[in-house]
Amino acid sequence: MIICSVDIGIKNPAYAIFNYDNTSNTIKLIAIEKSDWTKNWERSVARDLTRYNPDVVILEKQGFKSPNSKIIYFIKGFFYNSNTKVIVRNPTFKGGSYRNRKKQSIDVFIQKISEYTDYKNDILNKYTKLDDIADSFNLGLSYMESLLKKCKISKD
């Protein structure tokens, strides 16, 4: 199953692509990308999110009045009559200040990325600003960890 998790934004969106093998319960990071949706954002969003033909797209819930909410509605509509499931989840990290949540996200990303790819150093050297890719990575990983917990619960 191909999972695309997205850190929504106009200037600095990022997305992580995972391959989740539910027979062996293994997760592999296929790609992690940053983009720019400032010009012709609808086309850019559609291009980025269909590049890897995902089975599931994970989006982080936005505030009611957030300008990024329109992107969520666009993505849900874009995939409405398709085989791609769109899931909107609460943020991975809660509480504390915005700055502390971003730091926590980056720390967890740096700690865990090598478990899912052999290209940790390439990724860390490619991006100077890690918070967006860290958020997309952690959002996808959080979703897959919840799938694994459900599998373990149902097997007992």
Swiss-Prot record:
The cofactor(s) it depends on are: Mg(2+)
Q: Which GO terms describe its molecular function?
A: crossover junction DNA endonuclease activity; four-way junction DNA binding; magnesium ion binding
Keyword Hydrolase part of the UniProt annotation: yes
Enzyme Commission number, as recorded: 3.1.-.-
Cofactor: how and how many bound: Binds 1 Mg(2+) ion per subunit.
Q: Does the keyword Signal apply?
A: no
Mind telling me which Gene3D superfamilies this protein's record contains?
Answer: Ribonuclease H-like superfamily/Ribonuclease H
Q: Which InterPro entries match?
A: HJ-resolvase_A22 (IPR006932), RNaseH-like_sf (IPR012337), RNaseH_sf (IPR036397)
Keywords linked to the UniProt accession: DNA damage, DNA recombination, DNA repair, Hydrolase, Magnesium, Nuclease
For this chain, the family text in UniProt reads: Belongs to the RuvC family. Poxviruses-type subfamily.
Put simply, this protein is called: Holliday junction resolvase
Q: Which organism is this entry from? A: Fowlpox virus (strain NVSL) (FPV)
Q: What is the lineage of its organism?
A: Viruses, Varidnaviria, Bamfordvirae, Nucleocytoviricota, Pokkesviricetes
